[in-house]
């Protein structure tokens, strides 16, 4: 079942929001890492910024694929983060 045409530009806009979020996360992490002592004490927490940035990027790419008209199953199969793919796949499975 195709989406209503208004969904496609919304997906594109949401993808851009996710990219902006990634950019802001990366900037925040970089500013926190300027203090070497802080970065050393909080290295595991700072790694979470990278994980969140990757998740935001994958979300943006997924939304781009959907806005381009790719079928949701195909778009989901291209997600590179396994846990994210599994969670979204479970949600998609509930719809069919």
Task: Identify what each model region corresponds to.
Residues 1-96:
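Sequence/structural signature of long amphipathic alpha-helices
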